[in-house]
C-alpha cells in the first residue's frame, strides 16, 4: 500500500485550529493535540456558561429590586419585599419583567417607589370592597 502524504489539506486544517487557539497560553496554542483538546473544552465551557449567565443576571436583578424595595420602609407596609411586589404585579397583570424593574430601581428609585405605592393602594381598595 502506498503512503499518502497529506500535504496542504492537513496543514490547512491545523492552521484553522491554530487560529482558534492563538490566544491560549503555552502548549495549548502550539501543539496540535492539546490545541484540539483545549478547543473542545473551550466550546463546552462557552455553551455551559451561556446558560449560567442568564441565571446569574436574573439573580442579580432580583437582589437589586429586593434591596431597593426593602430600603424604604413605608408607614403602610412594615415589611414590603421583592416577593410581595412581584405577587402584586401579577395580580394587577402588569408586564414589567425583572430586568426592567432592576433598571428602574438603579436609574430612578422614586419611580419604583411610586409603582409599589400604586400596587399597595390597589390592594387596599380590593380588600376593602371585598373583591378578593
Curated annotation (Swiss-Prot):
It comes from the Eukaryota. GO terms for biological process: ribosomal large subunit assembly; translation. InterPro entries: Ribosomal_bL20, RIBOSOMAL_L20_CS, Ribosomal_protein_bL20_C. The keyword Transmembrane does not apply. Coiled coil: none annotated. GO terms for molecular function: rRNA binding; structural constituent of ribosome. The keyword tRNA processing does not apply. It is found in: Plastid, Chloroplast. It holds the Pfam family Ribosomal_L20. NCBIfam families: rplT_bact. This is Large ribosomal subunit protein bL20c.
Amino acid at each position: 500500500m502506498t503512503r499518502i502524504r497529506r500535504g496542504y489539506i492537513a496543514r490547512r486544517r491545523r492552521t484553522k485550529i491554530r487560529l482558534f487557539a492563538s490566544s491560549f497560553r503555552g502548549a495549548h496554542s502550539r501543539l496540535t493535540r492539546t490545541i484540539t483538546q483545549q478547543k473542545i473544552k473551550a466550546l463546552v465551557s462557552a455553551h455551559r456558561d451561556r446558560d449560567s449567565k442568564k441565571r446569574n443576571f436574573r439573580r442579580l436583578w432580583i437582589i437589586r429590586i429586593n434591596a431597593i424595595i426593602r430600603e424604604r420602609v413605608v408607614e403602610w407596609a412594615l415589611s414590603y419585599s421583592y416577593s410581595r411586589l412581584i405577587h402584586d404585579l401579577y395580580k394587577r397583570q402588569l408586564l414589567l419583567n425583572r430586568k426592567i424593574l432592576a433598571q428602574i430601581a438603579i436609574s430612578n428609585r422614586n419611580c419604583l417607589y411610586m409603582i409599589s405605592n400604586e400596587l399597595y393602594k390597589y390592594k387596599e381598595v380590593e380588600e376593602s370592597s371585598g373583591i378578593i
